[in-house]
């Protein structure tokens, strides 16, 4: 629940702190003192758009700070709130409470804080919206909208799981339909793409390039282009190292010379010379190996230019591929791998199209069944909700009023992109929230024709319809017990006995919820457990919030009773009203 609200420089309020208890709290005050700013502050904590024009004149920023406790909530709600705190890095105070804060700058961006941590406004609202339910005169206007009416019915019916299942199937159905339409429209394009890929892969496979082959060919061609020069160099080097058969005794090559040198050194008894003999022997081994490698090199050299021609022809084949598919052969091979993968994805067979058609049909059937199931839930809940709201209206001095809820199938044209055939044969429009059109109906006196709520209810009647609806939703535990419900002048257009009944109903609601009401009706204010008054505190027009004592309450109620605050008769009337309300057993 909300235990404290601090407002600074918001509208008419300069600095104000209000403390709240369990039960029923009312805020009253003269017109223009800033009562609505209290609710505006709570809306800001709930993530409402920050409006810099709300910052009080002369101030740089406005601040709204709320302190919340969770001790009165059920375990599931507490666990959900704690998850929000943990994900935001927010911390509780030592007493277990949580501080939520919103700061609005006149010139810069607004900021949000939760448990001492800066958070996005969405995170702040994720926490406070679990604790606060705010209702104002604008909500009465929203109640006339079909989507708001459907949302209220779904809350009462606890239809969230059925709605989510429907939405999931609808998303899958729409995706399958898009895929099917795309498949049909692109069948020719896909077939042409497949032909191009097959041709390219066949061309590449025919050439059969190997990784790095184009680079190796460049080196091979360079070598073969200088074949005579290479052969002469290798032959000369080999002859120099091993000699020739017709050489004289002094020019038989390095091998023979090194062999004779080693033998001469080995024949000596001198240790130093014998050590040198080993070094010469090592040199001889190196030279002999070089001679062998030169021989192998000469054997591998082509005898004519045909090898060069073959290499050049192969290079021309590879260049045909690199001109079309990639800059080098390794790139061509990568392109081929990607092309094979793409070709595997391109299912251009009739079987693939038929499979898509079957899948789309299956999803349409499942979606149709989910839509019917959701409609059944809504239709059953609509009867109960209408009955309970009508009963609440009777308790609010509207005994002859009748509230109805119509749930009908929204029909679609054949050209509608979300037309869905139901098992009943109806062609329904599969909207994001189902195929149902939900409409609240109302008539103030039974026997008259029931009309849509937007066309039949006056301002005062609409206030009572909304209160009745919220009471039913709250008492049916669709609004967690222990949470805070805020009503901003929803009793507009109401007076007399109806106002008394509204006060009684709000007081009963406060048995399970914290109820905070901004009102101009003394009959409603008299039923409150705590009475807060918003009043001007200085010549600059600033306002503050004051908690009223018993005598103060009498004076304020007398003022609200047609401005009779200073008269004995006004106080007597106010005292009687207060005593009657406080002694009401609320049965």
UniProtKB/Swiss-Prot annotation:
GO terms for cellular component: bacterial nucleoid
GO biological process, one term: DNA recombination
Alphabetized GO MF terms: ATP binding
Tagged with keyword Transport: no
Domain of life: Bacteria
InterPro entries per the UniProt record, alphabetical: DNA_recomb/repair_RecN, P-loop_NTPase, RecF/RecN/SMC_N
Residues given in the record as ATP binding sites: 29-36
Membrane spanning stretches: none
Keywords: ATP-binding, DNA damage, DNA repair, Nucleotide-binding
Function: May be involved in recombinational repair of damaged DNA.
Family recorded in the similarity comment: Belongs to the RecN family.
Protein name, per record: DNA repair protein RecN
Native organism: Mycobacterium tuberculosis (strain CDC 1551 / Oshkosh)
Lineage start: Bacteria, Bacillati, Actinomycetota, Actinomycetes, Mycobacteriales
